[in-house]
Amino acid sequence: MLGQSIRRFTTSVVRRSHYEEGPGKNLPFSVENKWRLLAMMTLYFGSGFAAPFFIVRHQLLKK
């Protein structure tokens, strides 16, 4: 009896919850503005690419 009521509650909660659906709606960032997306991706990937070079430069300049 208790198990059935718990099962009904969990399925009704899942059924009542609704999220936006469609391309790009399940991402943690917005893809609506392509120029902002380009800038954010450039910063993200560019910082990862440039970090080793800055670290080597820092080590070479260190006395």
Curated annotation (Swiss-Prot):
Keywords: Acetylation, Membrane, Mitochondrion, Mitochondrion inner membrane, Transit peptide, Transmembrane, Transmembrane helix. Residues 61-63 are mitochondrial intermembrane. One of its GO terms (biological process) is mitochondrial electron transport, cytochrome c to oxygen. Residues 17-33 are mitochondrial matrix. It is found in: Mitochondrion inner membrane. The modification N6-succinyllysine is found at residue 25. The modification N6-acetyllysine is found at residue 25. The keyword Acetylation applies. Residues 1-16 form a transit peptide. Disulfide bonds: none annotated. It holds the Pfam family COX7C. Belongs to the cytochrome c oxidase VIIc family. Component of the cytochrome c oxidase (complex IV, CIV), a multisubunit enzyme composed of 14 subunits. The complex is composed of a catalytic core of 3 subunits MT-CO1, MT-CO2 and MT-CO3, encoded in the mitochondrial DNA, and 11 supernumerary subunits COX4I, COX5A, COX5B, COX6A, COX6B, COX6C, COX7A, COX7B, COX7C, COX8 and NDUFA4, which are encoded in the nuclear genome. This is Cytochrome c oxidase subunit 7C, mitochondrial. It comes from Sus scrofa (Pig).
